[in-house]
């Protein structure tokens, strides 16, 4: 499977676990995994955690990792599947026309797509969520509905070529279902 490539869309402030877990898990399965970002550079990921006394998650600096390829350089036809992690990166990568082009290709070709946490922001901007069932970080329920999708509060939601999850605690179920596609 080393000739089968999977693309991960990331950027600064992507959630460390949501990038690195699928990256390493898919390499274990024998895939050639590439990380794409708005530009080819060292990315700065973050760690989101749930701590007592906070009304929402906290954010701390996470791992740094080199992007293998810039969005503009990506030929999505070279990849068999797509992973879109959460964190804050989807808030701004969704505004990148090449990011939207990449996402649209995977849905037009019915290739497997895994999204988690805040990733629906990027998929919604690409116009591919309408009519889909998807999980997301629960506070994104209004955004999911505004995109014409059905929000499902579950650890691994499968709808056609899309496998989605709420956040990093859902990783095992999320990747297990994605690998089946």
Predicted regions span which residues?
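Extended, subdomain-level signal for the structured scaffold at the beginning of enzyme domains
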Residues: 1-109, 113, 122-130, 141-181
């Amino acid at each position: 499977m080393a000739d089968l490539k999977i693309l991960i869309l990331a950027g600064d402030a992507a959630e460390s676990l949501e990038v690195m877990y699928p990256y390493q898990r898919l390499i274990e399965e024998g895939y050639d995994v590439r990380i794409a970002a708005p530009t080819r550079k060292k990315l700065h990921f973050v760690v989101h955690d749930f701590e007592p006394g906070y009304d929402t998650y906290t954010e701390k600096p996470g791992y740094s990792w080199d992007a293998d390829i810039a969005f503009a350089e990506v030929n999505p036809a070279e990849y068999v599947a797509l992973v879109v992690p959460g964190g804050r990166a989807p808030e701004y990568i969704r505004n990148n026309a090449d990011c939207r082009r990449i996402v649209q290709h995977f849905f037009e070709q019915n290739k497997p797509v895994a999204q988690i946490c805040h990733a629906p922001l990027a998929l919604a901007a690409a116009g591919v969520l309408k009519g889909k069932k998807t999980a997301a970080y629960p506070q994104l329920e209004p955004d999911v509905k505004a995109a014409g999708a059905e929000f499902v509060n579950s650890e691994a939601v499968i709808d056609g070529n899309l496998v989605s999850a709420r956040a990093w605690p859902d990783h095992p179920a999320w990747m297990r279902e994605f690998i089946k596609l």
